[in-house]
Amino acid sequence: MEHQLSPILSEIPPTVPVINGEPMCPVENYLLDPNAMAVCSNHSQIMTQHKMYNTWTCPQYWSQIVFVQVNPGEILTIKADDGSIQNIQGPADVPLIAPTGNLPPIYLPPGYMSQVVEENGIQKIVIVPQTLDYHVPMTAPVQQPFVAAPLLTYPQAPQLLYSPVQGEIPVPSYIQEPQQIPPLPLLPPLPLLPPAATFLFQEHLETYPQGRVNHNQFDERTVKIGEYSKKKIRDRQLGEHKINSTFSDTTLLLNKDIDMPAPPDSLCPYTVDTAPGTNTDNSTSDTYSLNTVLNTCTIDSAPRNMADNIPDTNTTDTITSSSAHTPSISTSNATFCSDNNNNITDSSISNYNQVTYDETHKPPDAKSIPSCTSQSASNPSVSENAHNPSSINDGLRPSDVASISENDHEETEANMGAGDNKQILGENQKKSQSSNASLKEHNTEDRTQPGCFNIEKPVVSNIQTRSATVSWTRKSNEKYDINSSMTHELALSSNGKNGTYKNIYTGNGVTVVLHDLQPCMVYFLRVTTIRNAEHRSVSEVVSFTTPGCEPDPPLAPTLISRTKNSLSLQWKASNDNGSKISSFLLEWDEGKGEDFKSCYSGRLKQHKLFKLNPSTKYSFRLAAKNDFGCSNFSETAVFYTSGKTPPAPLPPKLKEAGIYSLSLEWCAPTNPNPNDTLTYVLEMEEAKSGLGFKPKYNGEDLTCTIRNLQRNTMYKFRIFAYNLEGRSNPSGEVKYTTRPARPGCPNKPYVVGTIHAHQVTIGWDLPKDNGGMNISSYSLEVCENSDSANLWKIIYSGTRQEFLYDDLQAATTYKLRVFCTSPAGQSRPSDVLTIQTPTLPPESCRSQPLRGKTKSKDANLPDNRSVNGKPEAHVRGKKAKGPHQDRKVHPSSEKKCALGSQSMECGSVPARHPPSQCGTPVLTCKGPTCVIVSWEIPKCNGAEIIDYRLQWGQVEDSMHLIYTGPCLRYEVKGLVPATTYFCRVQAVNIVGVGMFGGTAKVTTPGTVPAMVPVLKEVESKVPAKLSSTCIAIRWEEPDCHGSPITGYNIEYGDKKVVTVKRITEYVLKDLQPNTTYRIRIQAINHYGLSPFSPSIRCKTKPLPPEPPQLNCVVYGHQSLRLKWGTVSSKKTLANFINYNVLMEDRSGRFSVIYRGPDVTHKVQKLSEYTEYKFKIQACNEAGEGPESDIYTFTTTKSPPTALKAPKVHPLNNNSCEIKWESLEPIKGDPIVYCLQVTTGKKANQIYKGPNTSFSFSNYHANSRYRFKVCAGRRYETSNGLQELWGPYSPSALFSTYKHHSGHGKGSGSKGKGNHNDKGEKCKTEMSDDTFVLTLLIGFALIAVLCAVAVQYLLIN
């Protein structure tokens, strides 16, 4: 049953802290989670405040306040007394006030625990993850949770409670009944408080009293509660005297498994007398009694170093007293050890000491005061590998480690001084002193032994702006050699000594160079030496500061706004690297693309440049300055000023029309700014579509080809021009049409009707594709079988689709084909139709002479009957078996034949054919651009030749017709020199066209180069400084005409010629400023000089002007007005001059403070009595002129400010005192004052000096005096003592009119006179603010009245 206990809340009895005899806060019972006292290794540090607690001296009630610290990301659930539950999201410090003595229970999520921490007198419950788990069996009885009712007792001495330090022995279950102590006679009555608990530490091998059950399983919650109790004892026993106290029992929960962590290093000898009580174990139903036992607990403390990993064996000797059934009063006399490490325990420190306990139960002496002894002895090791739950990586604080020795030493002295308690008697005091002495000696010896891996604090050297060198030395003791393997971890923090550290180096070296540091930054270092996972040591934290340097390069400036003549820029500051940025330096290229020059220097983060050119590119870069110097420049930012929208361009022109495309070209509009880049948008609308214009091209080119159009279709076009400012107006609309395509070939022709011997009708259909246009004509071609050359001839050309061909011959085969023609061209021929004309019967035959006698077996033929005068023959025939086969009829056939007359004799006529093939033409070069072509006459083939056709071209397969006529010679002109040409000839007669003859080839001879096609001026190639004496030109290389170009002749000015090599750019130098030159060029090759190109006119710019004289016309204490040059009434472009005024800054560099055409400028925001240096520079279109000499001007001293109106105080009947405010000296110069009085229209100076008051007497009665004062600044110069006066103050009125008493006749005058005087004084002293406020109130009243009137009128 003891292993199945449910995790319920346990009650931890607290103590009552008392400081300086006054109660601090009576602690009530805590209701905490059972896991509240578990130790968490990832908590950074828990500081325990050490207090001295004494008995109560006066009655006083206090409330218990507990702060629950909730980590980020966690949720705290609190259940109040009324049953309500509240969730609190971390991070937060939740104060819990318990005036009734019971805090609400805190429910924790699984895997978390609560830990009580006391910092600066405030107890906190820290919610942390549960990370440690102990499994070491210990003999102890398992008890059910029992909450004892609080009893009214006196305040008790500090209890034996220990802080939850890792590595300590847990608290086993030991229950005592609460006892009451009668009030002491020497103390006043105190309020009764709940009892405290006594915790006795027992070894799992101890001998239990009769009736007590031995359990080997411990509850983990008990361990945590025990650690909490040990922490509380340690916090309350520091520096205290031995105090008698009563211990009350505490109900603890035990579980089956628990470890035995090492005991604390600060255990001190003490004696505990237990009170009688009864303990009942529900799991075993055993009852045992401890009523008759008085226990004396003796603790032997032997400190050990935890780093050695050699735990001690804790031995407890228990002796049962023989005096049974004698209840006793339990007291505890505590004598504290003097070890320097016994009073401070930090959960983050990895070195702990272990002690050995001997508990001896002795019978009470006559005085019922238990004795306390302390023995210092070492115990043999029991466990070889004691678990050390503390990790150096879980929040170890080296600063605490470094300060342990000093704090411990101070606390040791305090504890030794507090160890003499007058309440300890006789033997017990002596035993305690001897025990403390021996323990102190042992602890002193242990403290003098060095750690096995102690290292000195790291040394930082060679500290640079962004790097530093860190080195350290390591030590060793006798147990470990310094040469043994070890690892060093160097951790760096930049957010404070207790901030987050980051490991930047791990290795066995002792010197590390740090890189990538930030300038002017404080860094903290610590070194951890690791031998293995259980032996670590941390050095003291060392801090160093990197020096400052110049700022980081800032980001490039950004554009706020722009106009045609201005640009507004802004920028952000970069890292100042330890010194505040004093100014920014903005440079620009002035729109020329050359070297950068300063345009602004100051602290502002924005700047606006004026008087810029429209649509111009400007480049900027930025640098920052501080006391260390100037940073590098930022990246270059490019901005453009605004400009005008371009004018409307001309309509686009048709460059070439295709079947499915149109090529257009256009000209750029007249652009006033040549630097402006134009973009063009071409829009198109298909005619009769009604869809409107749609963009088809967007780019910077001046040509465009639109494809995928429909053939023989009309389209509309217009064009826009764009620049950075917007779109121009559209150009005029133009219409262009795509070309039609050649028609498709017609279908195969067909025969209409019957084929006759001499005629046939041929028909054909329309082609399926007419190419987008109507067919204009059809052509029918025929080819006879008799033509071995298979020549086609056109027999018909027209618009009809049927043709009667009546020039046929009987028994002849013909081939026919047809093609059609449209305005787009000629189609391909159709498929071939083959026909054969039938044979004709003979009309008459001539009798052939017979040779010899013949005998005819045929019957006699009857007489022929003539039909239409011709004999008729009757023939019976059969159908031929095959095509074109005739069968003769036998004379014995039944059919009778009639014989015709004899035929006539005739002669044969030869057939006519196209001409034969021509021969190869003969080519003769007449010159580089002329060739004579001649050829011979071919055979005519029965028909006279009427024409010759000559084809000519540069490619043999692509020649074109250049001549048609009867001549046998043709002269070709306009040829290109040094070029190869091809030609051929064919003859034509009335029958047809003959075949082409052979192809001839000729190459024209070379000659002088062609004329240079393009010559233009290039202004960008000439620097601005040389533009007055130089002109740059560029040209395109012409055709060389068969001989490479070797150079060029450039003619300029008064027929001056410069010969250059084969280049296309040249700069003419040593020209006259502001002069126009006519320039032309010719090319040179082996054959000679080419013609001159068309001339161009170029003008040099005038020389840059000289700087004018700079003068200062107005001196001020904060400004200087400068003037230079003269103002011209007529400003033309030729004499337009800008001026640059430069001023020296703190670094000695001159920067531009004004740029423009004005001749005056006021420099403001200057310091008084300071010398400033200036330069001036004149600029025109030729560039910037030379800078002038340095001009030095000094500002004046600043005058004092105006004083308030003086105050007049009458002294007696004939004198008054005038007072005014005083001013502090200005930069060490004394202040003097001048008092002036005005009577009527006359003003007199009545005082001048350093005083602030003056007595005025002997004034006239019935007069008005006005006093005003001004301050002056007195200083010395080489000319002597000088005075600089400020403005006068407002005047103060003083009236000397006599006033009569109120009961007399002049009482009315007195009142009136007073009223007038006050009114006049108020009028005089009314300030500007009062006047403005009066006006505002008046306007407000008028507005309200108007609003009321308007509303009233509208409602009515």
From Swiss-Prot:
Gene3D superfamilies: Immunoglobulins (2.60.40.10)
Database matches in InterPro entries: FN3_dom, FN3_sf, Ig-like_fold, Striated_Muscle_Regulatory
SMART domains, sorted: FN3
Entry keyword annotation includes Membrane: yes
Membrane-protein topology: Single-pass membrane protein
Cellular component aspect of the GO annotation: membrane
Biased composition (Low complexity): 308-341
Pfam families with a match to the protein in the record: fn3 (PF00041)
Regions crossing the membrane: 1330-1350
CDD domains, per the entry: FN3
Polar residues: bias regions: 370-393, 825-838
Highest taxon above the source species: Eukaryota
Basic and acidic residues bias: start-end ranges: 439-448, 883-894
Domain Fibronectin type-III: start-end pairs: 454-549, 553-648, 650-741, 745-842, 914-1007, 1017-1103, 1104-1199, 1202-1299
Alphabetical UniProt keywords: Membrane, Repeat, Transmembrane, Transmembrane helix
Family the entry assigns: Belongs to the FNDC3 family.
UniProt-recorded name of the protein: Fibronectin type III domain containing protein 3C1
Originating species: Mus musculus (Mouse)
Gene that this polypeptide is encoded by: Fndc3c1
